[in-house]
Swiss-Prot record:
Top-level enzyme category: isomerase
Pathway(s) the chain acts in: Amino-acid biosynthesis; L-histidine biosynthesis; L-histidine from 5-phospho-alpha-D-ribose 1-diphosphate: step 4/9
Organism listed in the record: Roseiflexus sp. (strain RS-1)
Protein name: 1-(5-phosphoribosyl)-5-[(5-phosphoribosylamino)methylideneamino] imidazole-4-carboxamide isomerase
Keywords, ordered alphabetically: Amino-acid biosynthesis, Cytoplasm, Histidine biosynthesis, Isomerase
Length: 237
């Protein structure tokens, strides 16, 4: 199971939101590039970048920072936030991003997802962000009329091979991940699942590994020091 540090960007800084609320933001560093270097130096096998301003505006905003990270770290990067067109996905991949993550488009434009999967295959991942088990879109500001489980099934039918599942109510809270829903999403022959939201202890990581997820994205716990990256990596070796 991969341990993937999250770098969420807002206004050019590295931040964390509480339950996806843009009014409840904590700034952890003014230099996301330096943060990326720090996590990779500590052994991160991959970085999870989120362009929060992009998620709200519908188009990528932190392109220069993303480019600087991709070009200077020795680890693959996955990127989400504001990627809602073929052109936006192509630009992200041209920057050197290994994997692009789409969320809003998965709900509102499944035909786009089908086209992207056909064209880019494994480079496409889907973010299934859930509030009260229903999918959320537009930077988590809107709730759609489809459940997280149904959305994953719909994406699997389109050929999607990887899903990042986040329980918004737990994100940034240091509480615990939603093990029950995560377990329901991990199915033989289904998309690989990467878990996110509320992961803050070694026990959380071990429970997720037992469920069978491909990876775990860790954010606030790494920044507060509640969880060290070296301990997390060692726990799942």
């Amino acid at each position: 199971m991969e341990i993937i540090p999250a770098i969420d960007m807002q206004g050019g800084r590295c931040v964390r939101l509480y339950q996806g609320d843009f009014q409840r933001v904590t700034v952890y560093d003014d230099d996301p590039v330096a943060v990326a270097h720090r996590w990779v130096a500590q052994g991160a096998p991959r970085l999870h970048l989120v362009d929060l301003d992009g998620a709200r505006s519908g188009h990528p905003v932190h392109t220069d920072i993303i480019r600087a990270i991709v070009q200077s770290v020795d680890a693959p990067v996955q990127l989400g936030g504001g990627l809602r067109s073929i052109a936006a996905v192509e630009r992200a991949l041209e920057l050197g991003v290994q994997r692009v993550i789409l969320g809003t488009a998965a709900v509102h434009d499944p035909e786009l997802i089908r086209q992207l999967v056909q064209q880019f295959g494994d480079a496409i991942a889907i973010a299934v962000d859930a509030r009260n088990d229903m999918a959320a879109t537009a930077g988590w500001t809107e709730t759609a009329a489809i459940s997280a489980i149904d959305l994953v099934e719909r994406m699997a039918a389109l050929g999607v091979r990887r899903v990042i599942y986040t329980d918004i109510a737990r994100d940034g809270t240091l509480s615990e991940p939603n093990i029950a829903t995560t377990r329901a999403l991990v199915r033989p022959g289904g998309p690989a699942i990467i878990a996110s939201g509320g992961i803050s202890t070694i026990d959380h990581l071990r429970r997720l590994a037992e469920v069978g997820v491909e990876g775990a994205i860790v954010g606030r716990a790494l920044y507060t020091g509640d969880l060290s990256l070296s301990d997390a990596l060692a726990a799942v070796q």
